[in-house]
Regions:
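Hydrophobic, amphipathic alpha-helical faces that serve as interaction scaffolds
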Residues: 66-69, 81-100, 113, 126-166, ...
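Short loop-to-helix capping motifs
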Residues: 14, 140-142, 186-187
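Short linear motifs at protein or domain termini
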Residues: 1-81, 212-213
Length: 215
């Protein structure tokens, strides 16, 4: 965070940075790679090194990736943390949403339901992630938003998928529609109840897909 940058958040080349900080170029390369893995900087040919805005989910991802691949933590524990955070913050988050965001959520639900009906072989994973994370964005809590974003990365890394039972998927998005309706009508407690019902339904349908190994 204390690295010297210009107005475009560009960081000097390593040879210059080495002189400014009194650190060897080899050590800086190691630190740069670590910073890049945490989403602190980006490195591009010709463009050089640029410091990125802080993203807590990017900082979490390397550790979570290691933990999931190494079997150090269980998916269910992280999913339970996500569930509790969403439910605890839901009413505060819903009250913070303006009509523009509510209308966007409404449109997202409508377009996704249409896609499910017209293209039943397509699972709306990206839309599902956006629906759940967008509700909490206006709280501007980087730690909360980072963990909620990281949940979807962990879900992907875990190898857990929802079987393409599209009657079930449509039901999930009908829950989303009802949640948005309650938010629009300022019935926040009712919206929270629907969110909890939806999450219980979602958790019941999560099944691991066994990974095949070949010797």
């Amino acid at each position: 965070a204390a690295l010297p940058v210009d107005t475009d958040q560009r960081i000097p080349p390593l040879n210059i940075l080495s002189k400014q900080l009194g650190i060897s170029v080899a050590t800086l390369r190691e630190q740069l790679e670590e910073a890049r893995s945490m989403g602190v900087v980006e490195v591009k040919p010709k463009a050089g090194i640029r410091k990125l805005p802080y993203d807590f989910s990017a900082a979490l991802k390397p550790g979570l990736t290691y933990a999931m691949h190494g079997g150090c933590i269980s998916y269910s524990q992280f999913a339970d943390l996500r569930k509790h955070l969403e439910t605890v913050y839901f009413i505060e988050a819903a009250q913070s949403l303006d009509y523009q965001v509510i209308n966007y959520l409404d449109d997202l639900v409508t377009s996704t339901l249409t896609t499910i009906k017209e293209t039943p072989g397509k699972v709306p994973v990206k839309a599902h992630r956006e629906f759940h994370t967008l509700i909490y964005k206006d709280l501007k809590n980087q730690y909360l938003n980072g963990i909620l974003e990281a949940f979807w990365d962990v879900y992907h890394l875990s190898g857990l998928e929802v079987y393409p039972d599209f009657t079930y998927i449509e039901r999930v998005w009908q829950y989303h529609a009802r949640i948005v309706e309650q938010i629009r009508n300022c019935n926040y407690s009712a919206g929270l109840s629907l969110l909890i019902e939806h999450m219980d339904l979602f958790n019941q349908r999560e099944k691991p897909i066994q990974r095949l190994t070949f010797e």
